UniProtKB/Swiss-Prot annotation:
Pathways per UniProt: Carbohydrate degradation; glycolysis; pyruvate from D-glyceraldehyde 3-phosphate: step 2/5
Annotated protein name in UniProt: Phosphoglycerate kinase
Enzyme class: transferase
Taxonomic lineage of the native organism: Bacteria, Pseudomonadati, Thermodesulfobacteriota, Desulfuromonadia, Geobacterales
Catalytic activity: (2R)-3-phosphoglycerate + ATP = (2R)-3-phospho-glyceroyl phosphate + ADP
Segments forming a coiled coil: none
Family: Belongs to the phosphoglycerate kinase family.
Family annotation (SUPFAM superfamilies): Phosphoglycerate kinase
Location within or outside the cell: Cytoplasm
Entry EC number(s): 2.7.2.3
Amino acid sequence: MSIRYIDEIENLSGKKLFMRVDFNVPLDDNQNITEDTRIRAVLPSINYALDQKAKIILASHLGRPKGERKEKYSMAPAAKRLSRLLGKEVKLASDCIGDEVKAMINAMQPGDVIMLENVRFYAGEEKNDADFAKALANDCDVYVNDAFAVSHRAHASVEAITNCFPVVAAGFLMKNEMNYFEKAMKNPIRPLVAILGGAKVSGKIEVLENLCDKVDKIIIGGGMAFTFLKGMGYNVGKSLVEDNLIDTAMKTYEKARAQGVKFYLPVDCVVADQFNPAAETKVCPIQEIPEGWMALDVGPATVTLFTEALQNAKTIVWNGPMGVFEMDAFSRGTFAMVSAVANSYALTIVGGGDTDVAVHRAGEYAKISYISTGGGAFLELLEGKKLPGIKVLEDKGHL
C-alpha cells in the first residue's frame, strides 16, 4: 500500500493537524541551538499546512530525559528558532498532555502554531503506550509524520498514536527521504557503490549482508575495516578489532565476492602510538602496522584507490567516516572522500550522523544530491528493514 502525503489530504482548513517532527538539535551550555538543519528540513511541510489554514500542533523529543521532566531538555529553544524561521509566533505549551494543553489547542485559530513540550518527559513515549498516545493526540483531526530520523523507533508519538486518527499522512521531508532511498536502492542507475565507514563492524554487518545483493562495489573504511583485515591474516597492531565478528565479516566478504561485488579495503593507513590528537603519527602500508600502534585514518594510497573506484559510479550511498575525523591528524581520509563523492558525476546520498557532520565541515554540502536527516533510520533502511513509523503510514495512510 502507498503512503498518503500531506498534500493529498483534502481540506486542511481549520483542522487541528498534529505533526511529529524531529527537533532533536544540538545545544550549547547556554541552551542555544548550534545547528538547526532538522528544524529547517520540516519548514516545507509546516508552511504548506499554514497556507492551507490548518492549526498546527508540533511534537518532538530532545535528548534523553528518560521519562522525567528536565528543563535542560525543554523544547523552548526549538520553538524560539522555529518562530524566527517562520516569521510568526510559535507558542510553547507547558506540557505535551493534560487539560491545560487541551485548552490551549481548543483556543487555536487557523494558522496558529503550537510546540508541545518534550514527549520524552513521559516514560509512555518510549514504551509506545496506547494511553499516552491517546492523551498526546488531544482530539486532533489529522496526524502527519515528518520525523524520518525517529521513524525506526516504535514510540508512542510515532506508532501507537496513529490509531487515534482517522487520517494519517507523511510530510514532505519523509517524502524526500523515501524518494531518494528508492532511487538509490530500488531502481538505481548503475554502477551503484556503497561506502561504509565508522568504528565498528557490529553496527554495519546487517547493512553489508543486505547490500551484497544490491550493489556493484563496496568500499570499507574506518575502524570497521580492521576486523576484515585481521580476518585476512594481517597484523593490525592495537587497531580496533571485534574479534567475535571476524568469522561473520569474512563470510560477508566471501558472499560479496561470490556475487561479483568488488570489495575495497584500505591498503595503507595513518597510525598513532596512542589515541590522542597530539600522538606521534606516521603513514604505513597495511602489512607494516607497528606492534602497539593503532590505525586511526586511511592513508593516501587508500584515498587514491577508493577515489578510482568511484570514477564510473552513477549512484553512491555513503554512511560512516574513514577515520577519527574529529582529530585533525586523522581527518584527511574522510575529507578526501567527501571531495571525491561531492565531485563525482553520480547521484550521491549520504546517511546522517557523523558523515553529515564531515560533509558540512568540508564545505561540500551543496554538491551532495541528498543528505539524510536520519542516522539509525537510514541504516535500518539499508539493512532492508521496514521502519515502524513508515509501516503504519503504509497500513493506515492509503488513499
